[in-house]
Every structure is written in structure tokens, then in C-alpha cells.
Amino acid sequence: MHPLWWRAAERLLATREGALSVTDRDGVRYILKTWWEGRECNIRDREECMEAMHLLAGLHKDLEFIPTFPEMEGIPTPVIRRFLPSREYEKHNKELKRARRFLKQRSQKTWFEIRLAAVMDPFLEEAGQICEEWKKIENSHDVEAGETFCFCHGDYQYHNILRQDRGFFLVNFEKCQADGPIRDLYLLLRKLLEKSDWDCNRGEALLAAYESVRPLNPFERQDLFYRLSYPEKLWKIVNFYYNSGKAWIPEKNQEKLDRLLEQETARKKFLRILRP
């Protein structure tokens, strides 16, 4: 790994015997990691957010690899497959439909439920259309031998990007896995755009910061577009509501729904700019 990114990320410390974990008598496994004191990346600070994008692109660039496995007689060659978001979002669509049926059958509705029921149909129609388009693109994308993967952080958001005197320090790699880089880029970009009311200028600047280090290929750009297009925020609101007690609905739910609807025009504007 490049020395710059090696210094900027937590590391597992090995035991004297070279093991990266130890297990106690109860079978509980422990690890020891490096750690630096610091504060979370300030999402209101444009320069810090740009630097976080540079760091992510550098991390992806240094951790890219092409899977190769030695051929062994009688043993099938392992295959590393990309995560296909359309499959997960198809599941989300079923959950949204289930919640919509529940709301339609519910006779006594709160103001939040009335408001939610009124907006679900257009969002659900959009979600279904996005999934269909996405599947066609995924199916037409040839996954050839020698395709490049990278090790993703898995949870690259400002909580895990610590600022200290020496610069940024990345922590909590527990969800690290081999996948496409858009897994990380989408998560951070969506969080920052939501916090800035989907400001187009800021979104373009953040994406340009990433691409100044590691340009996206055409498929990655499409992947990012469709991930950002899916109404995941609505699904989160609906999922939390449907799986919790309905006798009392937190005011926070209403606030999140109102904010989502207020940002929808700006979100659509940014997506028109991003569309490949």
C-alpha cells in the first residue's frame, strides 16, 4: 500500500506470534488496532469535504486489484462478484408496497400517515422504473476475466473520517470488502448532498475532487447515477415507521419526511446534471 494511505488508516497489530486476533476461553475474539485522537470530518467545511474525497479516491486507487487464482485440478476457480444494488432495491420496493397496503387499510391515520400515504405512489413508481433500467444496464455490462475490483472501506462517512494535526485518519474498516468503488463514493456523496440540500455546485465539486485522483469509467458513472436516483431516504423513513410501534409516531419522522420532500426538486436537478 502507498505510504500516504498506510499512515492515514488504522492498522491491526499482530501478536508476538504474528496472529491478528486472539480468542479467550469463552470463544470471544479480540483485535488490537492503532488509533489517533481526532474529531469527525466537518461536513460544513467545503475544504475538508474535498480532502475527504481526495483521500477516498487515493485509497481506491491504491487498493485496486484484478482477482487471479491458481488453477487447481478438480476445484472450481473462485469468482468474486460485484454487489448488485438493484437486487437489494427490489427487496426495498416490496417493503414499500407492503407498507403502502397497510396505510391504505388503516382507518384512523395520524397526520404523518396521511402525508406519507399521499406521496408514496409517485416515489414507488419512480423506484420501480429505476430498478428496471438498472437491471438492463447490469445485464448488458460484460463482467470479463480480469475486471478490476478494489477493497472498499464499506462505511465511508464522516463519522469514520477523523481530523487530527497530521491530516485525516480513517477508522472502522469492519465492513471492508472487495467490490466496486461506487459503494463508498455513493455513501459519502449522498450524505454530503443531503446536508447541503443537494446543492448542484457542491455536488459537482465533490465529484470532481474524487475524479482528479481516480476518474470514473462509464459503468461506474452509471452505477453512481442509479444509486443516487433510488429514493433510499424515503425507504428508510417508511421502513422505520412500518417496523416500529404505530401507537406513537416520533415527531422526528415527520421532520425527516418534510425535509425529504423539500429537497426533492433540488435532488432531481442534480440527477439531471449527473445523468450519463
Task: Mark where each language-model region is.
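ATP-binding pocket architecture of kinase catalytic cores
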Residues: 1-77
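Active-site acidic catalytic loop and adjacent metal/ATP-binding pocket
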Residues: 12, 132-181
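A glycine-centered beta->alpha junction motif in the catalytic cores
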Residues: 28-43, 65, 97-106, 188, ...
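ATP-dependent phospho-/nucleotidyl transfer catalytic cores
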Residues: 39-41, 70-151
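Hydrophobic packing residues in well-ordered alpha-helices of helical domains and bundles
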Residues: 49-52, 116, 120-123, 203
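Active-site activation/catalytic loop segments of kinase-like enzymes and analogous catalytic loops
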Residues: 182-215, 228-248
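ATP/Mg2+ or Mg2+-diphosphate-binding catalytic cores
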Residues: 235-276
